[in-house]
C-alpha cells in the first residue's frame, strides 16, 4: 500500500512587512508545498516582495490577524 505524501502549506498574515517578508519566505523549508501571504491592507510593497519571493499573495482589506488567517484558510478549503 502506498502512502500519500502529506501536503504542507503555510499561511502568513502580513501588514507592512516589505522589509522582512522576502527573507521570511526564503527561510521556509523546502518541504513546504505552498506559501500563501495574506496582504492585510498594507501601504508598502509587501505584496510585490512576497510575490517576487515565490509566494501566492491574497488580499484582505479588513485589518486584523484573524481576518487575514480566515482568508488564507478559505483559499485552501
PLM features: residue spans?
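Structured catalytic core of nucleotide-sugar glycosyltransferases
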Residues: 1-77
Amino acid at each position: 500500500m502506498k502512502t500519500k505524501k502529506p501536503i504542507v502549506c503555510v499561511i502568513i498574515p502580513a501588514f507592512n512587512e516589505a522589509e522582512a517578508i522576502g527573507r521570511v519566505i526564503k527561510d521556509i523549508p523546502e518541504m513546504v508545498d505552498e506559501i500563501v501571504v495574506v496582504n492585510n491592507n498594507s501601504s508598502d510593497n509587501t505584496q510585490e516582495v512576497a510575490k517576487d519571493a515565490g509566494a501566492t499573495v491574497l488580499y484582505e482589506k479588513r485589518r486584523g490577524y484573524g481576518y487575514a488567517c480566515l482568508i488564507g484558510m478559505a483559499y485552501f478549503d
